[in-house]
C-alpha cells in the first residue's frame, strides 16, 4: 500500500472513530423529553409556591405529614440528591450528597422563609436540568445504584420525573385545601 493511501485510510478511520465517540456522548432523546416535562412541572411548582400565602407554608393536612414548606424543601433536596446518586458531582452549596440520604433529610429541616424556599427550588431545578442535559445517551443504559436498587440511568431519571409529578399533585391538593386555585387552572 502506498504511503498516501495509508494516510488517507488512517484519516478516514480517525473520522469514523471520532464520529462514533461524539454520537455516544450526545444527549439521549429520552433525556430531552424528560427535560421538557421537568420544565413544565418546574413552572407549575414555582407558580404554585408563589400563589400559596407564606402563612400557609406551615400548614399540613394532618400530624406527621409534610407541611407545604417541607414539601418544597423535600423537592429541592431530591433535585440535588438524584443527579448526585446518578454519578454527577454533588452540589456543594446544598450539602446534599447522593451517597448519603441523611444529607437530604438534613436539607429538608432547614428553616427558610417563602422567598428563600422559592429561590432554593429554582436553584435546585437549574442543577437538576443541567445534569439531565449532561447525561450522554451512552450512560442511560448503564446501571446505577439508587436507594439500594440497581437500575439504569434512564430509569433513575424517569423516577426523578415521576417524583416531581407526585409532589406537584400533593401541593395542588394542599393549595386547594387552603382556598388557593393553581394559577394555570
Question: Where would I find each of the regions flagged by the language model?
Answer:
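Bacterial N-terminal signal peptides
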Residues: 10-19
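Bacterial N-terminal signal peptides that target proteins for export
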Residues: 1-10
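Acidic/histidine-rich alpha-helical segments that form the ligand environment
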Residues: 105-143, 152-163
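Sec/Tat signal peptide C-region and signal peptidase I cleavage site
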Residues: 20-24
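Acidic/histidine-rich, surface-exposed loop or edge segments in extracytoplasmic proteins
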Residues: 25-28, 96-110
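Short, contiguous alpha-helical
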Residues: 35-46, 56-102, 143-185
